[in-house]
Design a protein with these regions (language model features):
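Active-site substrate-recognition segment that forms the wall
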Residues: 186, 199-227
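A conserved short coil-to-beta-strand element within the FAD-binding core of flavoproteins
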Residues: 122-135
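Conserved small/polar residues in nucleotide/adenosyl-binding loops
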Residues: 228-235
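Glycine-rich FAD pyrophosphate-binding loop
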Residues: 22-42
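Flavin (primarily FAD) binding-site architecture
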Residues: 157-171
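N-terminal Rossmann-like FAD-binding beta1-loop-alpha1 element of flavoenzymes
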Residues: 4-29
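Active-site-adjacent segment of FAD-dependent monooxygenases/related oxidoreductases
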Residues: 49-112
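Core beta-strand elements of the Rossmann-like FAD/NAD(P) dinucleotide-binding domain
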Residues: 146-153
């Protein structure tokens, strides 16, 4: 198989890139390790910044988002027994955020690629980029016990931190920048009405909490927690 750009990873990043390149006349092949059903079952973030909503429209994928998403012009900060509202619309020259789940925008991107006959190969196992520093890179993968090869001009890694792409970057050109925090987040998805029409970011002596939402019948809550339970006190 021959294409201009081979994209490893069929999540939102890979699909969005494939869509944008297609609109510029550039051919792509997307390789995804999981099934489409699995990708669409993953629960991820649900608040889209203004720049990304504009990108969805530019990619011709924003119609359902604009119809079903919830525009939020602000958010609340809970601290010291008070609840203060920050007016995003006022302090960002009219910008806002959109509450629209990543699962839904991924579905929209899939449908856009399907309409334009984009090539997305699911259940691609043992994906491996080759000759990535050369002018003729290629990617191999296995599906149904058969090995395939995709020759291309460019290989794009959109498969996340744990994906094969990052591990395939030659050590002499790889640069990594990270900030590791000594805590984690516990997230809960609840089929209940949100406690607030807009997000609440809460500061407390025992840590941070977030009251978020996916819709008016689906809530998402996060609490700041220790990375390891062995570090927790009995109380």
């Amino acid at each position: 198989m021959k294409t201009q750009v081979c994209i490893i990873g069929g999540g939102p990043s890979g699909l969005m890139l494939s869509q944008l390149l297609h609109l510029q006349g550039i051919e792509t092949v997307v390789l995804e390790r999981q099934s489409r059903e699995y990708v669409l079952s993953r629960i991820r973030a649900g608040v889209l910044e203004n720049g990304f909503t504009e990108l969805m429209r530019q990619a011709q994928c924003g119609e359902r988002m604009d119809k079903e998403g919830e525009v939020h012009d602000g958010f609340f900060i809970a601290h010291a027994g008070k609840l203060d509202r920050v007016d995003l619309h006022k302090y960002s020259n009219g910008s806002s955020v959109m509450v629209y789940g990543q699962t839904e925008l991924t579905r929209d991107l899939y449908e856009a690629r399907d309409r334009m006959n984009g090539i997305i190969i699911h259940n691609a196992e043992d994906v491996q980029p080759h000759d990535v520093k050369s002018a003729n890179p290629y990617v191999t993968y296995r599906k149904n016990n058969t090995e395939y090869r995709v020759d291309c001009d460019y290989v794009i890694g959109a498969d996340g931190f744990h994906g094969v792409s990052r591990k395939s970057i030659p050590a002499d050109v790889l640069k990594e920048y990270e900030k590791v925090y000594p805590f984690g987040w516990l997230g809960v998805l609840s089929r209940t009405k949100p406690v607030s029409p807009e997000l609440i970011y809460a500061k407390h002596d025992r840590g941070f909490a977030l009251c978020s939402l996916r819709s008016q019948v689906l809530s998402r809550y996060y609490i700041h927690c220790l990375l390891y339970t062995s570090d927790a006190a009995d109380e």
